[in-house]
């Protein structure tokens, strides 16, 4: 069954394995999440648990938000997400979800929002090849064919310059190197999407081998 938790990306560091290998890891701080709601097939048409992370200031919360978390007897949360495929019987409204639901060696998928890069050209944004830079060429870093005579238009899906980054990215099959339950930390092998202090979702892998 699916397990998951919300947290913040703290940054990257490295740890030594028992055999002496140096492992680059991303540190994710996942303070206690709270189960806000259990969704069932009878009432909602599908099964899921709704979890919240990071308390929101009282004056920034509206009445519906305060009423929604009243059953869980907690403060309104800044980040609220649903986890489908979870075992509903294992959770109760108001229950805290901590990092100890995972163990060392677990394989997880991590979802975050990629760093924004601003307005970028087709080469950086889409990985296109550039044209010749010398020998009289006047085609260097442009997008390419943009509407020849016959179709007399630009085709849908043409890779063009534009805003790059700031998209939801999921990196699959990452290994949890260490679970630090005392400090609410997960050390995940490799890098995960997003800037420092950005929100990430860690849940059990859907394609784990």
Swiss-Prot record:
Pfam families: Ribosomal_L3 (PF00297). GO terms for molecular function: rRNA binding; structural constituent of ribosome. Transmembrane segments: none annotated. The keyword Ribosomal protein applies. One of its GO terms (biological process) is translation. Residues 118-150 are annotated as: Disordered. This is Large ribosomal subunit protein uL3. It comes from Bacillus pumilus (strain SAFR-032).
